[in-house]
């Protein structure tokens, strides 16, 4: 799946939860630690245990890119007031198709573990989350998704 196909199937929309402060609307860039999920390997990776705060990255799919940042945002200057990045920091509060969390696999550098865990840009359906997997796989990554929680009708946040 290409980014263009993804955007056509799952059009961008404003964040479900609007930025609460100017800091949450501040668009972060490459100097702040933002990178684009284009092809493996990820430069200067930080590894963590999937499903935990350690090594958790935030990602979004926008109309023209797939930016990501380490949630702790250690390179951001001046530091964020909350101490952590929000998905809206990847968009400046603008529209995005969807977003979530990811962890890099410590043993297999081309494997990503993802969730659709975003309060601001959650995937709207199981198909949208499945299409995120297809998009990332088309870029050369192996992808393990936490999937969709049928009980809550939302992206699962726990890996099984």
Describe each model-derived feature in a short phrase.
Residues 1-160:
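Eukaryotic phosphoinositide-binding membrane-targeting regions
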